[in-house]
Amino acid sequence: MPDPGTTARLLGITVLGDFILNEGIDPILDNLTGRAGATAVALNPTVTAPSEQGVGSFQPPIDAGSSPRLFERPLWGERALWVRGGPSYRANEDFYADTPYVPRRPNDLTDAHGALIGDFIDAALDRGLKVYFQVGAVQPSGLRDADRPRLPDGNLPQDRMADTGSLASAAIRAYNRAYVRDLLEHYPRITGFRPDWPEYPCYKLDEAFQDFGPQVQTWAENRGFDFNAIQQEMTAFYTYLHGSLQNRDLEDFAGADRGKLSQISLLRRYPAALEWLRLKASLSVDLLQHWRDSITQFGGPEKELSANAFMPPLTLFTGFDFAGAAAHCQAISPKFYTMHWSAMVEFWGRVLLERNPGLDEKLLVRSLAHLFDLGDDIAATGLDAYGYPEPDEPHPIPNAPQERKIAQVLALAQGRARITPLVHGYGPLDDFTRRFRLVARSPVDGVWINRYGYLSDTKLDAIGDIWRS
């Protein structure tokens, strides 16, 4: 088990290369340390430039077309825009000989701006900040369908929000090992890595039924899981949810008992479902062990592994196991992305309404809000009570369930890893400070904020006031 390290509380902020290019190294570090009081920063090894529509990626991320997000700090004078990117370094392609995935090719942006990332890392470290790379846990460039997760029937999930790969993919793991080696060769001073989604994201209902691909089958059977039995029952459960769900199935979930009896009844009806949840958890822990081994091999045991993850109870669906992960991670950052919790009610609900004619929307929305534990007194009568909040709209998640989730994570981790929740900066000032204050004043080991682009100077000052008080 890795040493969780110092007991000093950490305050980290994610700053992507776009903003370093726009605002400069010293002004950003002044904001992080002077205004906010940050002690850590995370970034990615990428540099960008504005591009024409449809070229590159749209920022902020559109989250499968659902997000109305806007930056509060402009990029090239805009609050939302298309950008193209390039790696900040020239990869050693020899490292990638064991994987079909090749590193990103350097381009004109690499030549013009790539050195800025290394300069920022050095400047941040010289100011006493910890510096991490935030990277995808299973997201190589040019992800192939052969390495994408599969539904119980073997098909690819449709309309995914997170284009992540199979946790069992040998090709992706070989790429990860090479990528870690490459980054540590170019940036040997970094503190560690923060892999995102070392699990199966469950934003959409289809995503919750990942992964039944052949690579998972091989991995599972080699470890004693009855993959065929799991696949057969989860196919039946998926079919049930997509055409046989009835109002009487929702009454217990929508009621005061929040579906406790119904969940046990479903496990009796589909007993292999529990094995499926155990399989995903084992696979997530195994992936994190691979990350830890790769980091130790090329950077030494002192380089930190700090994983980003969903929150309970959603981790039951994603497979992230806090106790298991703590055996390999110095820190874990469960995401307090409350705009996503709200959006998921609508994402799942629209599919269930469409596929199950006659469902009562009031029963459904309360059932989903209870299933995700989004409040103690759910009064919503329709899915439109949730959805993706607008930039000036408070997130509809009260304090109590957030405090409950913190307690659950701390209990699950058992003190074996630092718990540093990841709060999202998106949203109006009062609502953001409510959410940040709640986490900052809880008994966790620190807080991360994603990301700098959503943090106006007023928000940065508020962070500093709360953190120092």
Regions found by a protein language model. Give the residues of each.
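Aromatic- and acidic-residue-enriched segments that line the glycan-binding/catalytic groove
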Residues: S51-P87, Q139-A162, D196-Q263, A326, ...
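Substrate-binding cleft/loops of secretory-pathway carbohydrate-active enzymes
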Residues: S141-R150, P201-L205, P301-M344, G427-V444, ...
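Active-site clefts of carbohydrate-active enzymes
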Residues: G259-L274, E302-F310, V365-F432
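Catalytic domains of carbohydrate-active enzymes, especially glycoside hydrolases
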Residues: D26-S51, F71-Y89, H186-G192, C329-S333, ...
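Aromatic- and acid-rich polysaccharide-binding/catalytic face
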Residues: D196, I230-A273, F320-P391, V444-T458
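Short, acidic/polar
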Residues: F19-G34, I172-L184, P313-A325, L429-A440
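Active-site-adjacent "subsite" loops/lids of carbohydrate-active enzymes
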Residues: T7-E23, V83-L125, L129-P188, C202-A229, ...
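Aromatic-lined carbohydrate-recognition surfaces of secreted/lumenal glycan-active proteins
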Residues: T14, L129-G142, R194-P198, F227-G259, ...
